[in-house]
């Protein structure tokens, strides 16, 4: 059974924990409390299997605290990560400015492929859902960008996340198959 490690990273108060709980069908948190370090959520998704072989997959979603005081822990968090989801609050201009730093630290430095990264522009309840005005600079504009609004259209983000998980598992499965073939030849 394949097991994938996915990091949820991004600025403080971007909605990482709320999204992580929703996408893993974990408990709801009604009051804001900053994540201290990391919170690991383990889950399975019946819609995601390994290369259509029917083999189940397990996931670890690492909900990483966005405070810079945890920066010294980031290398340990990144170890053996298969994917990174950068979550930001699209309504806060400073979050947009921080995006390149998160991308550099969690995607470029550990040499992950852009396909292993997804951006989520999270819109908090009551903030509106302005999908049209978000322009990102290179290299962020090459990444998959999904808008989330759990109040208006929660299933859209769930479906996009399942697609993302499938792409991560397919990549892992192909890599494992290549490794097995190289051993046999």
From Swiss-Prot:
<comment type="function">
    <text>Small GTPase-like component of the intraflagellar transport (IFT) complex B.</text>
</comment>
<feature type="modified residue" description="Phosphoserine">
    <location>
        <position position="137"/>
    </location>
</feature>
<feature type="binding site">
    <location>
        <begin position="10"/>
        <end position="17"/>
    </location>
    <ligand>
        <name>GTP</name>
    </ligand>
</feature>
<protein>
    <recommendedName>
        <fullName>Intraflagellar transport protein 22 homolog</fullName>
    </recommendedName>
</protein>
<dbReference type="GO" id="GO:0003924">
    <property type="term" value="F:GTPase activity"/>
</dbReference>
<dbReference type="GO" id="GO:0012505">
    <property type="term" value="C:endomembrane system"/>
</dbReference>
<dbReference type="GO" id="GO:0060271">
    <property type="term" value="P:cilium assembly"/>
</dbReference>
<dbReference type="GO" id="GO:0005813">
    <property type="term" value="C:centrosome"/>
</dbReference>
<dbReference type="GO" id="GO:0005525">
    <property type="term" value="F:GTP binding"/>
</dbReference>
<dbReference type="GO" id="GO:0006886">
    <property type="term" value="P:intracellular protein transport"/>
</dbReference>
<dbReference type="InterPro" id="IPR027417">
    <property type="entry name" value="P-loop_NTPase"/>
</dbReference>
<comment type="similarity">
    <text>Belongs to the small GTPase superfamily. Rab family.</text>
</comment>
<dbReference type="GO" id="GO:0030992">
    <property type="term" value="C:intraciliary transport particle B"/>
</dbReference>
<dbReference type="GO" id="GO:0097542">
    <property type="term" value="C:ciliary tip"/>
</dbReference>
<feature type="binding site">
    <location>
        <begin position="123"/>
        <end position="126"/>
    </location>
    <ligand>
        <name>GTP</name>
    </ligand>
</feature>
<dbReference type="GO" id="GO:0005929">
    <property type="term" value="C:cilium"/>
</dbReference>
<dbReference type="GO" id="GO:0035720">
    <property type="term" value="P:intraciliary anterograde transport"/>
</dbReference>
<keyword id="KW-0342">GTP-binding</keyword>
<keyword id="KW-0597">Phosphoprotein</keyword>
<feature type="binding site">
    <location>
        <begin position="63"/>
        <end position="67"/>
    </location>
    <ligand>
        <name>GTP</name>
    </ligand>
</feature>
<keyword id="KW-0969">Cilium</keyword>
<comment type="subunit">
    <text>Component of the IFT complex B, at least composed of IFT20, IFT22, IFT25, IFT27, IFT46, IFT52, TRAF3IP1/IFT54, IFT57, IFT74, IFT80, IFT81, and IFT88. Interacts with IFT88. Interacts with CFAP61.</text>
</comment>
<keyword id="KW-0547">Nucleotide-binding</keyword>
<dbReference type="Pfam" id="PF08477">
    <property type="entry name" value="Roc"/>
</dbReference>
<keyword id="KW-0966">Cell projection</keyword>
